[in-house]
Amino acid sequence: MDLPAGITKAGESITGEEWRILGHIYHAKHECDSSFSFETYDPAGTFVPPHIHTTQDEFIYVLEGRFDLYLDGQWTQAHPGDLVRMPKGVPHGYYNKTDKPSRALFWVSPAGKLKNLFEQLHDLTDPDEVVKRSAAHDVDFLPPDAVKGG
């Protein structure tokens, strides 16, 4: 898929879709063969547990709030203006441990199956089903007891 020229407005999706996944809200910002980006809205107390992208590098550009991150075996924080780099195969997860929402622009390269995964996860409430469907789309979650601290 080629990249179309244009602007995707803040808080909107290039496709008009909004995905709600376990408390988070995602808007697709662009999609082409080489990459896929999405804006996240993460209410206070939400998180995405540690996982690995087996075929994609992932990035987070923090727009608002604070991200507590598990990244390659270490705990760290990212703030507005920070860019987080998560190479493929490196365990990572993010948490909003504050009392305010956070927002960020995420993107992966190559695009892979992530957009299709979000379409399948929309409105699911069963975390086990999220893990199962994610694995079929090259995203492998770590076991809950695999990460200490944080």
Language-model-detected regions and their locations in the chain:
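Ligand-binding loop in jelly-roll beta-barrel domains
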Residues: 68, 88-114
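Short acidic-glycine-tyrosine-enriched beta hairpin
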Residues: 9, 73-91
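A short glycine-rich, His/Asp/Glu-containing loop-to-beta-strand
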Residues: 15-50, 56
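Conserved hydrophobic/aromatic beta-strand scaffold that supports enzyme active sites
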Residues: 28, 37-39, 59, 75, ...
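Short, conserved beta-strand element in jelly-roll/cupin
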Residues: 39-43, 52-71, 109
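Acidic/histidine-enriched, glycine/proline-rich intrinsically disordered or flexible terminal extensions
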Residues: 115-150
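Hydrophobic small-molecule pocket/channel-lining residues, especially in calycin-type beta-barrels
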Residues: 46, 67, 116
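Basic/polar N-terminal segments that are highly enriched at the extreme N-terminus
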Residues: 1-12, 147-150
